[in-house]
Amino acid sequence: MIDRRTLITALVAAPAMGALGTALSATTAHAADLYDSNTALYADPALVEGVDYGRRLRRHLVDDQDPAAAAAPVRTTVIAPHGGGIEGGTSELCLAIAGYSPAGPTDTAPAGPLHDFWMFEGLRSSGNSALHVTSTHFDDLTGRAMCAGSLNVVSLHGCTAAQAGLEAGAAAVLIGGLNATLRQYLAEEFAAAGIRAATATGDEEIAGVHPQNICNRSLLGAGAQLELTTELRAAMFAPGKNTRLDRAANTLPLFWSFTAAVRTAIQRLEATQPVR
C-alpha cells in the first residue's frame, strides 16, 4: 500500500503570498488506508451507501449520429475522490470547477463551459478519514470509466501543511500529475490570482506521478492533481461554516478565485487540443 512519505516542493507562484522555498523537509503524511481499493470499501457489510458514504456524478451525453458533423470527445472530467467529510471542501470545489453551484447541479446552466464530474464523499458525522482510498488504488468502475473517456482529468484533494512539508498555518496548493502543460497553466493562473502554489514532487501520492493514479487514467494518460492545505480550504468558507452541511452556502471570494483559476487553466488546455 502506498502512503504519503516524502515531499519536496519548488516555488512556482504568487510572491505576494510568500515563498514556499526550494526544498522542504521530509514528512510522514497519510496513514495507511483501511481499505486497499474502492471495491473493498463497497464490499464491507458494515458500511451503508447513503449513510456512511455517497457518490455523485454528472456525465454529459455524447451523441454522434451525423457523419458530417462529428461530436467532440469529452474534454475534461473533474473529480473529488475524497470528498464530503474526508477532505473537506473538495466536493464543493469539484462542482464549482465543473461549472455548477457548489450546492449541486441545477437546471440553469451557469456562464462558461460545463465539465463532467465524479466524487466520492464521506457522509459520517465523524470518522470519515477511515473511508480514504489512496488515488493509485482507486477502482470505482464508473469513476474510472469517466476518467478513461476524457482527454483531461483534474483531481482535487486536501492535505495538512505538515503533510505538505510546509510551515504551520501555510495556505497553499500543490500542483501534481503527469500533464506538464496543465500544471504550467495552473501555476500561472494561481500566480495571477495571488494564490500560493508549488509544484509537488517526491512522494507519489501527493505528486500524482504514478500512471495508476486516477488523475492520470485519462485518454492521454496524464492529468493534474491539486492538493490544498487545510488552511487554504478553510479560508474559502465563512468562519464557523466550514462543515459538510454548511460549506456550499457559505463560500468566500477565495473559493471563487481558486475556481476561476482552475477553470481558466482548463480552458487554455482545451483550446490546444483537437476537436476529435
Locations of the language-model features?
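N-terminal secretory signal peptides and thylakoid transit peptides that target proteins
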Residues: 1-15
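N-terminal catalytic or cofactor-binding beta/alpha core of small enzyme domains
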Residues: 11-275
